[in-house]
Amino acid sequence: MLTYAQAGVDEEKTAKALRAIIDAARRTFKFRMNKIGEPGDIGHYSALLDFKDFYLAITTDGVGTKILVAEAVNKFDTIGIDMIAMNVNDLICVGAEPVALVDYLAVKEPNEDVFQQIAKGLYEGAKEAGIAIVGGETAVMPDLINGYDLAGTAVGIVEKDKVVTGEKIKPDDIVIGISSSGIHSNGLTLARKLLIPKYGLDYEYNGKKLWEWLLEPTRIYVKPILKLINEVEVHGLAHITGGGLLNLKRLTKYGFELEMPPIDGIFKLIYENGVPLEEMFRVFNMGVGFMVIVPQEEKENALQILNKYYESFELGKVIKEPEKIKVKNYGITL
């Protein structure tokens, strides 16, 4: 049995340590009070800055330890997609259209071939997301870093009457799940430490090598979500990343009653190697990379739109019971 904390990522410890930084950040809000760019609160997927007629949304994220798998097999051509995805999927959670991104690449030493591979993924990700990469920073730090780290900061725009924060969510709203492409870019530390020592990266599982399962690019949900919010009343949007289903708690005080898909693919291999069921749903997306909350009368319209892009399905509903996430078909509550 192995948990995320035992693998080295203790989220409770991290949250506790972050309090000082978050408190300091909130104290800086006064520097923009009653000025262009006055910020809202911290805690949603993207921060919203007030620009009178619209909000500027801003977020930052990285690839994480997925890049260690890329380094191990010398295949870096998709991690740029992951970095773009992790940022733009957070922007659309507030209804924002992604506009621009700057990247941050830290390396021990520059490698032209690796940089070309990363650039390929960045371009493909930007193309799918409809975003411009307008700058960045490459830091060569042989005394500090061993290998590579890739992150980015993205901005988007949303009209004030189109912003989605979750405040409209109410009991009996319908939760729709959009399928993931696999593990995406979260929980890789746990997956790597659990599976690679036992099987090796070339282990064949259900027709693919382990490294292929781990490097499958994160799905980009920009096109279906922007289409959806222009045609359907949407009450909430959730990118299922670090924290798994707990991400739903960012949106509302209400709880959720869900039936999740069968455990399959890379998640089945991880689960069969001893990760507790509750931990699986706290760490991984479990086959659902994005969730949409809509009123009951919009369910069919939403499903029709979303299924034109990726497999989408009704997962359950919002319940009055506060802050409980019940996964009925697995008998767990988070």
Swiss-Prot record:
Pathway: Purine metabolism; IMP biosynthesis via de novo pathway; 5-amino-1-(5-phospho-D-ribosyl)imidazole from N(2)-formyl-N(1)-(5-phospho-D-ribosyl)glycinamide: step 2/2. It is found in: Cytoplasm. It comes from the Archaea. Keywords: ATP-binding, Cytoplasm, Ligase, Nucleotide-binding, Purine biosynthesis. Pfam families: AIRS, AIRS_C. InterPro entries: PurM-like_C_dom, PurM-like_C_sf, PurM-like_N, PurM-like_N_sf, PurM_cligase. CDD domains: PurM. Its EC number is 6.3.3.1. GO terms for biological process: 'de novo' IMP biosynthetic process; adenine biosynthetic process. The keyword Cytoplasm applies. GO terms for molecular function: ATP binding; phosphoribosylamine-glycine ligase activity; phosphoribosylformylglycinamidine cyclo-ligase activity. It catalyses: 2-formamido-N(1)-(5-O-phospho-beta-D-ribosyl)acetamidine + ATP = 5-amino-1-(5-phospho-beta-D-ribosyl)imidazole + ADP + phosphate + H(+). GO terms for cellular component: cytosol. PANTHER family: TRIFUNCTIONAL PURINE BIOSYNTHETIC PROTEIN ADENOSINE-3, TRIFUNCTIONAL PURINE BIOSYNTHETIC PROTEIN ADENOSINE-3-RELATED. Belongs to the AIR synthase family. This is Phosphoribosylformylglycinamidine cyclo-ligase. It comes from Pyrococcus horikoshii (strain ATCC 700860 / DSM 12428 / JCM 9974 / NBRC 100139 / OT-3). The lineage of its organism: Archaea, Methanobacteriati, Methanobacteriota, Thermococci, Thermococcales. The gene is purM.
